[in-house]
């Protein structure tokens, strides 16, 4: 297959992400509400699970990138002692209040538990990996079909110094570790694998695959746990996924935005009040949604219009 990774975003009509095509597979109506190519409506309040995940991601980004940079500046031999010292030094400079400000009390406990227990893992990683970038935006232009573009953000790109290979980290905070069967078909991991093959080739290095870095959201050391899975799909799996994604992308482009009628999907959906009001009717504009739904307790609007900026690439 031909891939295009221009540094400048193409003017593709249809823009997708792993999350968006996953949403479409669950419920095409939900994708219609959320997609920035369509209604671009978001719930105004972030869920607690999203808030803690965002805070942990930001903390990991700061710790990994700053400690790795410090080690390189000092021409470190990357011994565990030097890596631990660098991590401790960076940790001492960080004001955690900036990460905690958006969290409720329970999630503050979870955040503190994670940062206390995961800190040693950062030092261990830095003995093997050099951090090349965190929160790295990418895009796949005219892929998997012409006039469609997939975009995303790699949590962390590292160089495995021993293997001389590129690896991508995907950090996940979770209540329970994901079953292996889910990861086998994970849309996000497959898309990252596609990008990783070309990224590593451009760097004239081997592609080492992806590291799914799962961190349990425990409030105490007893509830905390950490688990990793390594993924590098075969060429056959790579091609099979490409054909699957092509079919799903074409279906999404031609969708009539039907509701899913799935119990658990509807129960957990932020957009349930909209469907409850409109039924099978498809609202035509974001204005009628933003203006129509107000929280009875707070008096605040429940949804906001969140269009894509013209130069956005993430």
Report each predicted region and the residues it spans.
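Nuclease catalytic cores
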Residues: 18-68, 108, 112, 135, ...
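Mg2+/Mn2+-dependent nuclease catalytic core
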Residues: 130-247
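Terminal, charged accessory segments of proteins
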Residues: 1-26
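Short, compositionally biased low-complexity segments
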Residues: 25-36, 72-96, 209-225
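A non-catalytic, helix-rich entry segment at domain boundaries
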Residues: 58-137
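Short amphipathic alpha-helical segments and their helix-coil junctions
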Residues: 6-13, 29-42, 94, 168, ...
């Amino acid at each position: 297959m031909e891939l295009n990774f221009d540094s400048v975003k193409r003017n593709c009509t249809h823009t997708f992400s792993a999350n968006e095509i996953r949403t479409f597979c669950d419920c095409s109506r939900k994708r219609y509400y959320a997609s920035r190519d369509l209604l671009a409506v978001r719930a105004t309040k972030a869920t607690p699970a999203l808030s803690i995940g965002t805070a942990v991601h930001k903390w990991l980004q700061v710790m990994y990138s700053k400690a790795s940079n410090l080690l390189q500046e000092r021409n470190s031999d990357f011994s565990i002692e030097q890596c631990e010292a660098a991590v401790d030094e960076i940790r001492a400079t960080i004001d955690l209040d900036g990460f905690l400000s958006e969290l409720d009390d329970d999630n503050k406990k979870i955040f503190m538990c994670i940062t206390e227990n995961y800190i040693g893992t950062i030092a261990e990683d830095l003995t093997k990996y050099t951090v090349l970038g965190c929160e790295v935006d990418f895009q796949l232009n005219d892929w998997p079909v012409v006039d469609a573009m997939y975009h995303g953000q790699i949590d962390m790109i590292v160089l495995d110094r021993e293997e001389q290979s590129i690896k991508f980290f995907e950090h996940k905070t979770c209540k329970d570790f994901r079953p292996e069967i889910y990861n086998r078909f994970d849309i996000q991991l497959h898309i990252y694998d596609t990008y990783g093959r070309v990224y590593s080739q451009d760097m004239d290095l081997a592609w080492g695959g992806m590291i799914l870095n799962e961190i349990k959201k425990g409030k105490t050391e007893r509830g905390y746990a950490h688990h990793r899975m390594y993924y590098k799909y075969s060429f056959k799996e790579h091609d099979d996924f490409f054909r699957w994604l092509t079919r799903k992308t074409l279906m999404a482009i031609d969708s009539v935005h039907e509701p899913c009628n799935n119990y658990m999907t509807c129960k957990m959906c932020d957009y349930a009040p909209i469907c409850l009001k409109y039924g099978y009717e498809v609202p035509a504009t974001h204005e009628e949604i933003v203006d129509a739904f107000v929280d009875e307790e707070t008096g605040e609007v429940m949804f906001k219009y969140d269009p894509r900026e013209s130069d956005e690439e993430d």
